[in-house]
């Protein structure tokens, strides 16, 4: 017996240990259940209210402390507030921790209440209680509640997901186990059909009693809407509000209310995007989310693992005209792609001839041609078919070994003849010299699509003679040329990818003249989502639909980092154990396997393996015919829209009735799924994660053998296959599952087929025959493991890059939230001035003149100390003294702002306060005018201190948004550029971390300086009353200027009179008949009947500009001489 076996025998395996830990909780629930069951309906609801109050009372003291601290914070000096806010944060964390203690104490009673609520709805058509206001409000909105006299009557049937449902579920013991696991912040793995949705009601109900919000996350909007409608009445019965964000538009009042509900359902993407939108809001009332308290993720593996490969990005258009480039270079790329296809087809024909020879040398030559064809066009259907023939794949792999050996020293021999090389596994394309020559054939410049060696060019420039100005001009030209060519090469690469690696009706569909992405996991259209980095535009150009404008990232986050923000995170799925390590590494989530309520009776058969797709699909159709004749419903799972439509056509030709559920037909989802369990029904579905909960079987169907699952291809992920299998055999029902696989399937072609192909060859396997063995099924699973490991690597790398960004995002978003809410903005402004003082002192530590100039530019103030003092001070003393003086200056200027504004605000509020809610205050920094909106009453009550806060908010928000947007662009560019570090045997991630830190530091420094410069200069423009001497001098100047102007006008008029006399007389038309009456705003005629006096024409006289030389000849500017005061 090995050590592991001995330890397992001694302590039990992980599942046994987990269940042992949870069992006491379940025993307590079962112990308290009889007393809960004995309560009347009203007493049951009263018990819930009692527990709600108990939870609030448990933390009442701490909440009172926070309230008290918040009240007095505005009266404190800025310097004192930091300590108070730190204390508030500390107490709020303590409240969250104490909540967990009281929830654990309340768990047995609360779980028992929810279980008995489910029982009462299952056993009674109506549940009657004494009506309260919450019941009356519900009755006005929903059909399942009605009010009769003082009674609220809850029906046990309602609509969910488009179907009428009657409540018939009561929690089993295993579901109580699952509920405890979810409350503990772990992942519950429960077999498909074990009622995961019902399990969630237990921890959701318990945690919602805190009134801090519970988020239930689903993989698609159909499920989020359905589950909120399905489970909602149970929560509402106990006075809890329920809503679903997917029912409301983003940034709407309705969506904000959905987040304020005790329980909020929604899709993972919408939760993430709402977070990003909140961090782009410009007013607190635009925020929709509250604190991230507790989240339960349904199909947790799909959300936290599969979807985690793609970051969430909010982007906006940028005026760069890239779309023209994609359309401009499309013809060039089409020429190259068509040339490559023709070449690869010819190579394949030649390879077939040579490989049929008896001469081994000729066979080897043919094998090289075959490999060359494979590197140039791996998705060629004729090539895929040829590779499935006996011995062919093995021969090509042998050739590949030669080219891959010695660090790919000989690879150029295989690829030089091609126009470009495709690496399908890594999703990349590389142009060869031959391809570049063909691309540039119609241009005059042979390097039109070649990136110059910028490093050597700049190095040569440094060694050249010439002035600094000349060198700089040449450097700018080199950089500009590189930028243009870089954009050009990038466009070509993305177009090549679009033409060779992305297939219509597979990765995307074209609907309503738009390219729409299909989610590879769920088969649904991802409306509003676009491929990044210009790839979407390339596909639009390829499909000849409108190429949308280029976009720039405004906000981004990975799902991993979004969900890690929750205080407590848990999830449920039928298939998490295979990824338990990843869940722990990234999310610190433990996976607990919950036993099934009844043994699984489903027959999972071995994979049936064919050589070609054609044979496979014919076999699938034959299998469907046999199963439907036996009276069994059949669910056919496909991996793409294209395959589902192909099978649909084949079934139609055989006159077999069927339903199709895919990205193009998702509107009929509820109806199709509801029918999928009926006798002899055939349903084709692109992906079935989370859809099968509605497949119910009749007795006839169960007697016939239950639901039959047919997989038409093994998915990249074992979990997706397990989800498909799990649609049959739910709750002990009979059923079967089998996968049909061919060597031409993508998974087999890329990762598995060499061993299986070799085995088929050894067995003398003929076309049309099927191979079925447990060992082969295991081989397919090993191929899936390879893909999963590869995908895990992608996710982990994405997270490592986003972790760098995440720390920066937290700093920026925290500062932005402080500015938006206004509570802590004073502290942040204080820190901004301090950081700017530090940066100025550090930058000019040895240069007093530079220091003085920088102070004037940034703080608009003179140096507070002499050159001798500056040189004698230590750096920290210099910073402290400078900060002290800068802060004094800032406070003095803000005080001045309030003094200037107060009389105006007082007059407006006291005379017209009822008419206006907000007032716009013009504030200038001497360069531009900022119109700052402020609440009129608040400005009046605070003696205009609110105006200062509004000014701070608008400037800080503007600077953060501008700086962060530009920083994201630079980070995108950095991430692409650091990949080249791998050619120098350096870790790109390490370079990225170092460079991104420098970029962030520079961005924050610039942001601080710009913010400080505007805030320090901010003032309300006023016209100051001049002194008597100034008034007299001004009048004298104005008289002199007026005299000069009168003289100039008289001379001009004399010239014009002469010109008029010399010119021929012109004919004038009487325009009076076109005159219309003028009316005022009330519609009254304002035009007098008396003849109007003739108005003199307005002539444009030559006027002196403020910055022009003064006409008096003094040499000064007009504004500083005779124009002063004008």
UniProtKB/Swiss-Prot annotation:
Keyword tRNA processing found: no
Enzyme class: translocase
Pfam families linked to this entry: P-loop_SecA, SEC-C, SecA_DEAD, SecA_PP_bind, SecA_SW
Record: residues binding ATP: 175, 193-197, 694
InterPro entries linked to this entry: Helicase_ATP-bd, Helicase_C-like, P-loop_NTPase, SEC_C_motif, SecA, SecA_CS, SecA_DEAD, SecA_motor_DEAD
GO biological process, one term: protein targeting
Binding note for cofactor: May bind 1 zinc ion per subunit.
Cofactor(s) the record lists: Zn(2+)
Binding site for Zn(2+): 1110, 1112, 1121-1122
Record flagged with keyword Membrane: yes
Protein's cellular compartments: Cell inner membrane; Cytoplasm
GO molecular function (one): metal ion binding
Entry's EC annotation: 7.4.2.8
Domain of life: Bacteria
GO cellular component: cell envelope Sec protein transport complex; cytosol; plasma membrane
Chain spans, region Disordered: 1060-1126
SUPFAM superfamilies reported in the protein's UniProt record: Helical scaffold and wing domains of SecA, P-loop containing nucleoside triphosphate hydrolases, Pre-protein crosslinking domain of SecA
Catalytic activity: ATP + H2O + cellular proteinSide 1 = ADP + phosphate + cellular proteinSide 2
Annotated PANTHER family: CHLOROPLAST PROTEIN-TRANSPORTING ATPASE (PTHR30612:SF0), SECA INNER MEMBRANE COMPONENT OF SEC PROTEIN SECRETION SYSTEM (PTHR30612)
Assembly notes: Monomer and homodimer. Part of the essential Sec protein translocation apparatus which comprises SecA, SecYEG and auxiliary proteins SecDF. Other proteins may also be involved.
Function statement: Part of the Sec protein translocase complex. Interacts with the SecYEG preprotein conducting channel. Has a central role in coupling the hydrolysis of ATP to the transfer of proteins into and across the cell membrane, serving as an ATP-driven molecular motor driving the stepwise translocation of polypeptide chains across the membrane.
Protein name: Protein translocase subunit SecA
Source organism per UniProt: Parabacteroides distasonis (strain ATCC 8503 / DSM 20701 / CIP 104284 / JCM 5825 / NCTC 11152)
